[in-house]
A protein has these predicted regions:
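Short amphipathic alpha-helical segments, especially helix-boundary/capping motifs
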Residues: 25, 50, 138-139
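Extended, solvent-exposed, turn-rich assembly/linker loops in the middle of proteins
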Residues: 30-100
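Sequence/fold signature of self-assembling virion shell proteins
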Residues: 82-189
Length: 189
């Protein structure tokens, strides 16, 4: 494989790792965060978000990030209308999946579906069912992410003539204060 092809494969692998890293963080928040009181279908997006935020504030916390499923993020965009402010930087401008509303950063988590596996702070692998999760609201310092090994490289392959793209990462996740993270689920899917 030519170096340019391996470089492209490395870029793709890095993107996949980035997506997996986000999925694992979201799974940790969903697993270790506190369940929001409301579990009924969401009919008023703004009211629902404010109610969940109120739960965190009443627990002496604050919230500034909302990780949303794509379906809920669409509801946020419709509800917020012109009040939704996209976050501007090169990566965000190309995806359009992060913005500000109600004093919080909303992130569209494309991988927030099905079952997600992650390693918790003890090194145990957990599987989290995301089928009923609509969003996770939290304070950005409530999620600890610690990586103890990262490598991304293009190397000569020992299996064939050419180059091989390799990306590896070992990361642990922990919600350090469950009062600062609320998981909004809808009962029964």
């Amino acid at each position: 494989v030519e170096f340019s092809v391996a470089e492209e494969a490395l870029s793709t692998a890095t993107q996949e790792i980035r997506e997996g890293w986000m999925q694992c963080g979201l799974a940790c928040l969903a697993q270790e965060g506190t369940a929001a009181t409301l579990t009924t279908a969401i009919t008023d997006v703004k009211e629902d978000i404010i109610a969940t935020r109120q739960e965190i504030v009443e627990d002496k916390g604050r919230a500034n990030v909302v990780m949303c499923t794509p379906a809920f993020y669409s509801q946020v965009l419709l509800a917020a209308g012109k009040d939704f402010t996209p976050v501007m930087n090169d990566r965000i401008a190309s995806t359009g999946n992060v913005g500000q509303w109600l004093g919080m950063t909303f992130v569209e988590a494309n991988g927030a579906q099905g079952s997600i596996k992650y390693y918790d702070s003890t090194g145990a692998q957990k599987t989290v069912d995301m089928s009923t999760v609509q969003y996770v609201m939290y304070y950005h310092e409530a999620l600890s992410v610690i990586s103890n090994f990262e490598v991304a490289r293009v190397i000569d392959s020992e299996r064939f003539a050419g180059s091989l793209a390799q990306v590896e990462m070992n990361t642990g996740y922990k919600v350090t204060n469950t009062a600062l993270a609320r998981v909004r689920k809808v009962a029964g899917g």
